[in-house]
Amino acid sequence: MRLYVTPASPWVRRVRVCIDELGIGDSFEYVQTRWPHAWGTRTVEMPADFVEATPVVRIPALVAGDVTLTDSHSIIDYLDGKFGNHRLLAADGPERWKALETNALACAVLEAQIMRRAELLRSGADRSDDFIAKMRDRGLRCFAALEKQTPSFGDAFGLGQITTAVACGYDEWRYGPGWREAAPALASWYDTVTQRPSMKATEPAETPQR
């Protein structure tokens, strides 16, 4: 299987953490993509194989035989169903709905983080400080909501917890530790799960530039 990646993307990281938790890392060829800083607002010319794998030109993208998947949600669902027997996200029932509740909040954080980052990369005249603040505040509200769910996490590290941990890690790496004030119990939980091998192996780094 071929997975198109970049080390900065939290969407890529949640897939890679899932891959490591499922123990299937040796089944993948990881293809590093390169992006200019204008990726958020301008058309970026990419290699033909990448465009074929993902016409929407975003990462991650998975090519697995005759299956091509172009977002982290479908990739994780495919891998967990095919190789994990739905270990990361239950196929149905109350356990699934609770996990999806957590996952949706954590994904909302990721979306806000990426939109904030894209706006910050605009030139000064085009940048909206109000929009940047709006995305920051959205993320903090979601962290506060996840704080309320932290006691229910226990020792589990399924999809909801994985996405939450990735959201915590990206915010701290990109924007600093301010999120911890909104969610101290979540921060304590994060400090524990960040020691997992799957989290250590996927720590974020800047994307190679073109």
Which sequence ranges carry the predicted segments?
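Non-transmembrane alpha-helical segments in soluble domains
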Residues: 76, 80, 100-103, 143, ...
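Long hydrophobic alpha-helical segments typical of transmembrane helices together
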Residues: 181-210
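Short, flexible helix/strand-to-coil boundary loops that buttress conserved ligand/catalytic motifs
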Residues: 16, 73, 114, 175, ...
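Short polybasic/polar patches that bind polyanions
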Residues: 20, 173, 195
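GST-like fold's C-terminal all-alpha helical module
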Residues: 106-191
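GST-like domain detector, emphasizing the conserved glutathione-binding G-site
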Residues: 1-129
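Short, surface-exposed recognition loops or helix-turn segments adjacent to catalytic cores
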Residues: 91-94, 157-159, 204-207
